């Protein structure tokens, strides 16, 4: 069946040619296979036979099933990119998604913890044993440098540069950026590297990756997630309020509230689009509004 084959080729191209993350490729692949199943039910076998109305009807049906606006936006983006890919390769005469309106996503404000909550979580990891030193370094680096969990897991010894003052990070699409290591993060990282990392090191991968599990393997996203939740639970932070990405949100939001320039935060986070970073201005406005409501006598 031609459409499904075209989709598999497109997903492979996303990873190989455009450097998109595995998570994005999986999401787009899932969206497009749903679309392909819909086309099959309508007896449409070739991408060249798809009309704008077919796409609109598919998205309308998904919306009627209760699909969130954010999911609809992603599916629309996947379909647009798929047909653009086919058109660029002259596999279809026209792009049926060209005249479609992009669905508007509701602004979803990032979840953030207060500074006091983050500090309590970091201060809770007090031990000098190897696991405590490692966990403290991981938490401090995530919060102090604003890393994505995938970037933390991929961090290698060679990525610690400038005598331990900077990290070289390879973000989405393998884009490189340089991030300063703050004082607290730097001290925690030095303590881990100098004191406990060698107790986890075994095997070839232990020679390259910074953060290692008890078996000497690099961390997975799920492994980091478990540590973050466990350390947060120890100071009473509910599981639904914390994740590695929440610490990244806290990094940006707390810097903004202390007067950091939005463009500088964009660079540190590795956002290609300033619009992605500007959501934190809404978070700060919401925080200021809450303070006003709590403390102004006539609020």
Where are the predicted features?
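Conserved catalytic core of the tyrosine transesterase superfamily
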Residues: 1-299
């Amino acid at each position: 069946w031609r459409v499904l084959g075209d989709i598999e080729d497109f997903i492979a191209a996303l990873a190989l040619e455009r450097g998109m993350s595995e998570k994005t490729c999986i999401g787009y692949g899932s969206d497009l296979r749903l679309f392909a199943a819909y086309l099959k039910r309508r007896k449409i076998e070739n991408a060249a036979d798809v009309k704008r109305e077919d796409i609109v009807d598919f998205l309308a049906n998904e919306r009627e099933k209760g699909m969130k606006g954010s999911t609809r936006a992603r599916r629309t983006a996947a379909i647009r990119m798929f047909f653009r890919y086919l058109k660029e390769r002259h596999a279809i005469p026209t792009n049926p998604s060209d005249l479609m309106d992009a669905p508007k996503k509701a602004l979803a404000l990032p979840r953030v913890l207060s500074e006091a909550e983050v500090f309590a979580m970091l201060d809770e990891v007090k031990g000098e044993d190897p696991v405590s030193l490692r966990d403290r370094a991981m938490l401090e680096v995530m919060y102090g440098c604003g890393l994505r969990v995938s970037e933390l897991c991929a961090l290698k010894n060679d990525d610690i540069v400038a005598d331990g003052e900077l990290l070289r990070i390879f973000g989405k699409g393998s884009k490189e950026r340089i991030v300063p290591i703050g004082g607290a993060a730097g001290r925690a990282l030095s303590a881990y590297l100098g004191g406990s990392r060698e107790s986890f090191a075994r095997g070839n991968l232990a020679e390259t990756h910074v953060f290692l599990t008890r078996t000497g393997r690099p961390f997975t996203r799920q492994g980091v997630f478990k540590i973050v939740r466990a350390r947060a639970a120890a100071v009473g932070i509910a599981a639904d309020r914390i994740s590695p990405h929440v610490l990244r949100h806290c990094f940006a939001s707390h810097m903004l509230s202390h007067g950091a320039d939005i463009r500088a935060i964009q660079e540190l986070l590795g956002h290609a689009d300033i619009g992605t970073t500007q959501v934190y201005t809404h978070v700060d406005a919401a925080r200021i509004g809450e303070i006003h409501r709590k403390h102004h006598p006539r609020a």
